[in-house]
Amino acid sequence: MAVPKKRTSKTRTNRRRAQKKARAPQFVECPQCREKKLPHRICQSCGHYKGEEIIEV
């Protein structure tokens, strides 16, 4: 079985783990109703996506 030749330092381990942090979701404004929504998603309040009504709300 493969075994590491050198011990991984705390700094190297922490640097690797720093990429796994949780980020706050970025919201954008819906151009139709001005509500906050997630990017590249249908607006939950008006049902529009890319200027077209996808679902009736």
Curated annotation (Swiss-Prot):
<dbReference type="InterPro" id="IPR002677">
    <property type="entry name" value="Ribosomal_bL32"/>
</dbReference>
<comment type="similarity">
    <text>Belongs to the bacterial ribosomal protein bL32 family.</text>
</comment>
<dbReference type="InterPro" id="IPR011332">
    <property type="entry name" value="Ribosomal_zn-bd"/>
</dbReference>
<keyword id="KW-0689">Ribosomal protein</keyword>
<dbReference type="GO" id="GO:0015934">
    <property type="term" value="C:large ribosomal subunit"/>
</dbReference>
<dbReference type="Pfam" id="PF01783">
    <property type="entry name" value="Ribosomal_L32p"/>
</dbReference>
<dbReference type="GO" id="GO:0006412">
    <property type="term" value="P:translation"/>
</dbReference>
<dbReference type="GO" id="GO:0003735">
    <property type="term" value="F:structural constituent of ribosome"/>
</dbReference>
<protein>
    <recommendedName>
        <fullName>Large ribosomal subunit protein bL32</fullName>
    </recommendedName>
</protein>
<feature type="region of interest" description="Disordered">
    <location>
        <begin position="1"/>
        <end position="23"/>
    </location>
</feature>
<dbReference type="InterPro" id="IPR044957">
    <property type="entry name" value="Ribosomal_bL32_bact"/>
</dbReference>
<keyword id="KW-0687">Ribonucleoprotein</keyword>
